[in-house]
Amino acid sequence: MAEIRIYNPDTLGKPLGQYSHVARVKAAELLFIAGMVSAGKDIDAQCAGVFPQIEKALQSAGAGWGNVVQFTTYLVHSQDIPGFMQFRLREFPRMFPNGAYPPNTLLVIDRLVQEQFLVEVQAIAAL
């Protein structure tokens, strides 16, 4: 497994959610996972479908959540930010039991590939 150090520098403010400001990775093989979407009635249901897909992609390369060094999240509605944060608050301690949450960039955009999708999450992992 790659040597990964996820941390928050003292010179930066505390993260606003389940993420860290910095992921330092000693040169490693990288795994780029395309943005994942999932149908569902609301943001929680869609997140509950998206993250297992990411996990399957990680497992296909012999990796797991501990290999993730970056998430990029796209939301269609700013009012879904609290629901997305609640999902992470509930699920990330199980996925990242050491509390080293990967950096995450969250963008609110006009729409995704199909109107039914509310969230898309892309991941980068170091192997």
Question: What does each of the following model-derived ranges do?
Answer:
Residues 1-70, 75-127:
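N-terminal presequence-like segments and the immediate start of the first folded domain
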